[in-house]
């Protein structure tokens, strides 16, 4: 077992201990919903944190708290959108009911703070982490509200408003561990660049998610769920504006590619491991299907 695998195993153990130690969460400790993800945040924390020289214990605390926040956001998202599956498992609301799903999501947020409180880092670092978590949660809620109220009428502002919405809703929590790591390592000059990188990649991932919804290839989600639920989806927006498939596929692809290119450029001025994380871990997750391979699905999507 290599060092990263060992650390990821420790992370899962820490998360399971968090579940077992709470009488309410203990009932969910064996639910695959919480243990079947790709552990992206844990991998980011370990890879990025090692580049900044942080201890494994501190990195695992950052990873555990941000993973709990991520799980809470997924539970709430599934509930709001009424998506029935996640990670190949029944959504929490579908399996246990909407009221319990709401409460479990809230409880996970509180547990994220508890991990910070119980961490062995300095009191000053705990204050920093707590502040960052509070800001990220507030931003995620703001983005979720913006998603519900998204205005598609002003075509010139579609991409600007979409970026603002997705960078808050998805990006704030995604950038959280990187921000905590740089601040803990006393590298405040890197925070803004890391923040922009992870916001960009989160928006790029949201575009990938939009395409999956549009093409009907996402497990557990009704086909064109975004359209039925009134959620902003770039593909549906541009279809409704009368764009040809070739034009809107190219337009969206170019926009996503610009986000990735900007992130890679910013990574050049940061520790080399940031570039490795982008190229080997994150960019493969956001690759869009080209128009040529999507033609069979477009009749359904439109």
What function would you assign to each model-found segment?
Residues 1-302:
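All-alpha prenyltransferase/terpene-synthase fold signal
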């Amino acid at each position: 077992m290599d060092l990263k695998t060992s650390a990821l195993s420790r992370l899962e153990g820490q998360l399971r201990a968090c579940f077992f130690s709470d009488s309410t969460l203990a009932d969910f400790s064996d639910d695959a919903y919480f243990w079947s993800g790709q552990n992206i945040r844990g991998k980011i924390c370990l890879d990025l944190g090692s580049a900044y020289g942080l201890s494994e214990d501190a990195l695992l605390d950052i990873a555990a708290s941000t993973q709990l926040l991520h799980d809470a956001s997924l539970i709430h998202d599934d509930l709001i959108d009424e998506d029935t599956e996640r990670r190949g498992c029944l959504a929490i609301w579908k399996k246990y009911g909407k009221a319990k799903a709401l409460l479990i999501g809230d409880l996970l947020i509180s547990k994220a703070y508890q991990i910070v409180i119980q961490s062995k880092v300095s009191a000053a670092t705990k204050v920093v982490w707590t502040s960052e978590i509070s800001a990220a949660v507030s931003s995620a809620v703001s983005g979720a509200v913006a998603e519900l109220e998204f205005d598609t009428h002003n075509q010139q502002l579609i991409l600007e408003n979409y970026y603002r919405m997705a960078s808050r809703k998805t990006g704030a929590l995604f950038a959280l561990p990187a921000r905590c790591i740089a601040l803990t390592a006393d590298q405040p000059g890197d925070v803004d660049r890391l923040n922009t990188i992870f916001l960009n990649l989160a928006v790029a991932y949201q575009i990938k998610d939009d395409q999956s919804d549009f093409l009907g290839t996402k497990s557990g989600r009704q086909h064109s769920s975004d359209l039925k639920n009134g959620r902003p989806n770039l593909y549906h927006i541009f279809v409704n504006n009368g764009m040809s498939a070739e034009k809107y596929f190219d337009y969206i692809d170019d926009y996503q590619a610009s986000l990735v290119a900007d992130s890679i450029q910013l990574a050049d001025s940061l520790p080399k491991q940031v570039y490795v994380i982008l190229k080997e871990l994150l960019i493969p997750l956001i690759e869009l299907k080209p128009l040529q391979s999507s033609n069979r699905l477009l009749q359904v999507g439109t």
